[in-house]
Regions:
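A generic local secondary-structure boundary/capping motif
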Residues: 1, 20-23, 56-57
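Switch II (G3) loop of P-loop NTPases
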Residues: 6-18
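ATP-dependent NMP and nucleoside kinases share a basic, alpha-helical "lid"
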Residues: 18-30
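Short, well-ordered alpha-helical microsegments
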Residues: 17-20, 74-76
């Protein structure tokens, strides 16, 4: 990838991968916590929610910057004992202050609306006094967009640049037009 000129790589790291030591020795620039659910509990995965939560949180010991969904109750746990710089995102203004994040490190989505225009669904929200549009409907896509915006900002990209990308983003096989 480096020989091909790639400067950034985005990858998913599973809690099972962490448990099985598949990322030992890898240092990440940024790690993102999007959500916590019960879908990884069972044979071959995690024995309990506590185990799942523990392994999911270990990723934040191997990164310089941690970005978290402040609307998820497990976000505080993810950043306990961790030495990375914390950034957050939320759809509720008060969450950043309640979870111990400095306001300058929290990106808040406001005035979220789901629209139908020309037979197509889209999502509009405001953050940092900017309007963002997504061709993808659903609040979970707002959370994913906030995570992407925070990540790109931490990498030095301008929010305007990131907003242009989000406006035209299509995920093949998911909610395609």
């Amino acid at each position: 990838m480096v020989k091909a000129g790639c400067r950034y790589a985005v990858m998913e790291v599973s809690s099972q991968g962490i448990k099985q030591h598949r990322i030992d020795g890898i240092w990440f620039e940024i790690a993102v916590f999007t959500n916590f659910g019960e879908d990884h509990i069972g044979p071959g995965e995690h024995a309990s929610l506590g185990e799942y939560r523990y392994y999911k949180s270990c990723l934040f010991e191997q990164c310089r910057i941690g970005i978290g969904n402040l609307d998820d109750a497990q976000c505080s746990y993810m950043f306990q004992r961790k030495c990375c710089t914390k950034y957050g995102f939320t759809c509720r203004e008060e969450e950043g202050q309640e979870r111990g994040f400095r306001n300058s490190h929290v990106l808040t989505a406001e005035k979220i609306s789901f629209l139908m225009e020309g037979g197509e669904l889209k999502t509009v929200f405001y953050a940092d006094d900017r309007k963002y549009e997504l061709a993808l409907p659903g609040k979970f896509n707002v959370y994913n967009a906030l995570a992407a915006l925070q990540t790109m900002s931490c990498l030095g990209f301008e929010r305007e640049e990131a907003g242009d990308v989000l406006k035209h983003l299509v995920v093949r096989g998911r909610m395609e037009r």
